[in-house]
Amino acid sequence: QDAARRDFTCNALYYNPARGEITDFHHGVADIRAKRLVMIGDARARYQEDPVRMLRAARLSGKLGFQVAPDTAAPIAECLHLLPKEPLARLFDEVMKLLFSGAAIDCLKQMQALGMDGQSVHPLLACALERLPENQGRGIVALALNSTDSRLRADQGVSVGFVLAAVLWPQVREAWQRAQSSGLRTMPALSAAVAETRAHMEKGWGVPHRFTASMREIWQLQPQFEHRRGARPFRLLAQPRFRARPRRRAAHPPPGSVVP
């Protein structure tokens, strides 16, 4: 019964340490060997039962390098409308698992391959998907996610606030430019753009305040990058907000860091 409640066949394997045996109720071993992600049961019914499984399909297949089985992928398009009805906190948690999976770029590309446009899932993913191709894949979003993937694969700590600030910086920058065009000076315009973006994040996106606070600090430091002489650039590089926390094995990770 427990095996039948699992979502994918690769997650329904049971190991008996006393006998050194794996019990496989749903042909999961064969699917793993074939690098194939297969839903247990009727995929449409399982997505309707728990829409977050669609995000899990993109994340697991992207991270593991699996192909999603046709019967598992086919119902996603008609079930996508169910995802926004899920609690914001749960969706945000799944978004974090995807962005900090160690294979964020591959997971996002898999979302696209499965027909999952970011806006139907979560605004953070919509921003990431929209900006990913910028500068031939070397824009700020792609660079930040690639750097995060590399650090996670190297078992190093990462800063959630820094990564999310990078993903949303193009949006903040555009709002900043609009505010300046309306007549506001540099810093008041930036503060207005940051406040506008934070309001969206905290009310409609489910992003916790502890992350938006560090993101605000990072955004408000951006004008200082224009000062490139003397000691100021070196002081800026030493800013704690631009430094990832060291990896720590702890029951409760420090706020602002992710330990996969």
Over which residues does each language-model region extend?
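Catalytic cores of the polymerase beta-like nucleotidyltransferase superfamily
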Residues: 1-260
